[in-house]
Amino acid sequence: MIIKSAVLDVVCGITSKIPDTGLPEVAFAGKSNVGKSSLINGLMNRKALARTSAQPGKTQTINFYKINDELDLVDLPGYGYARVTPAEKEKWGKMIENYLHTSHNLKAVFLLIDIRHDPSANDRQMYEWILHNGYEPIIIATKLDKLKRSQVQKNLKAIREGLQLKKGTTVIPYSAETKQGRDEIWELIESLTGGEPSEEA
């Protein structure tokens, strides 16, 4: 996709009504510090539109990033951060559940998994939760640049086995450093939202 414009369009908190912008949406879920903001910045060709942080749990809202007035990339709150109180975890869970239940424009949910580690219990729970809400999660294996090339296939297999993925389920390795996987992700987004894949640096 040629990125002509990318803006943070809507920020939703726990009491916010999910907006109906009329634009197709693709959402990104994953545990805290898995690299969601870095991925979204990479997709938008922006360095810091989606705020990144070394501190897990930074994203506490649902953030809608409007691309070319054509579609929204939706950044969901991260899960699994140990220092978050049970009340906060419940609040974030309700926000995500509310979004999945009420969005009329959601076309796909991407679930991000750190390629260096086996899927956690929280990852498996989120995968099942997305399925339960009627979406087939597309898996993005993040932090590819942190792994030796010789380990990649073994770790991708561990992700497939850990999530008990169906045969043929898409798993895309992604590197925030080299942008490997970016084109493949955009091609999927374009096919899911009805656009034509093209590219601009």
Question: What are these model-predicted stretches?
Answer:
Residues 3-15, 146-201:
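Canonical P-loop GTPase G-domain recognition
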Residues 18, 56-63, 77-107, 115-129:
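Switch II of P-loop NTPase G domains
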Residues 22, 48, 61, 88-92, ...:
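Helical mechanochemical/support elements of P-loop NTPase systems and associated helical scaffolds
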Residues 43-47, 100, 163, 189:
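Hydrophobic aliphatic residues
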Residues 58, 71, 78-81, 116-118, ...:
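Conserved nucleotide-binding/hydrolysis micro-motifs of P-loop NTPases
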Residues 65, 142, 185:
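Residue-level signal for inorganic ion chemistry
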